């Protein structure tokens, strides 16, 4: 059972909270707990709201992944935050441990197609004229034997994007048993660590940084993780 997510910021317009790994963002056919439902229950109880509380889902995160997510508390905030997703002013940056030795800097551009029936995403050649373009840039922050700690900046937001693109580049995420060499029970080494946006009403620039807990695969990377906050703003899209 999951508890109410840790909330980093809350006002009348939005909530920024931490998603635990393996918690659904939104309910599905499994009937398992989901973050949206937990936060709606929290709002309903805290503010004694009759009926179901409104909470708009602004962006998503794969179930095995943890990290920062923002939600809109009004329809106006939802529309404005969604517009920031489209124009790229709402930025989502991730920390990941990948298998292999990553380049110092790289930009990956691929065309992705999702198999809805199997919930799998694959890279396809561009000439097939199907699928959606996916772009991300990364910086290798540290190397350790056959593993790399990378800071990833998303340019687009496709399903399973980081997992699929990094695996296609020969750098599968540690613990990813869907697209990599992960084993059952391993926790995928992908964490939404930095979120930057403009407040939907005041326009104030807001930046949130929350590293993963020092456990599992993240143990031993603490010093390098602390240095990532200064790296993301410097990552540029190559080519």
Each language-model region and where it sits:
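RNA pseudouridine synthases
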Residues: 1-239
């Amino acid at each position: 059972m999951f508890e109410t997510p840790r909330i980093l910021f809350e006002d009348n317009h939005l909530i920024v909270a931490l998603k635990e790994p393996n918690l659904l963002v939104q309910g599905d056919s499994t009937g398992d707990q989901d973050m949206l439902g937990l936060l709606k229950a929290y709002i309903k109880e805290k503010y004694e709201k009759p009926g179901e509380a409104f909470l708009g889902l602004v962006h998503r995160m794969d179930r095995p992944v943890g990290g920062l997510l923002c939600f809109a508390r009004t329809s106006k905030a939802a529309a404005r935050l969604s517009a920031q997703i489209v124009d790229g002013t709402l930025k989502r940056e991730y920390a990941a441990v990948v298998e292999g030795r990553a380049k110092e800097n790289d930009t990956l551009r691929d065309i992705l197609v999702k198999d809805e029936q199997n919930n799998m995403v694959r890279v396809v050649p561009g000439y097939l004229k199907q699928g959606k373009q996916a772009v991300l840039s990364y910086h290798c922050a540290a190397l350790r034997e056959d593993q790399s700690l990378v800071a990833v900046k998303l340019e687009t937001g496709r399903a399973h994007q980081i997992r699929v693109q990094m695996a296609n580049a020969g750098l599968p995420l540690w613990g990813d048993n869907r697209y990599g060499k992960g084993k059952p029970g391993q926790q995928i080494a992908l964490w939404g660590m930095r979120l930057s946006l403009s407040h939907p009403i005041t326009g104030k620039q807001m930046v949130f940084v929350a590293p993963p807990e020092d456990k599992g695969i993240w143990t031993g990377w603490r010093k390098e993780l602390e240095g990532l906050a200064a790296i993301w703003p410097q990552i540029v899209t190559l080519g």
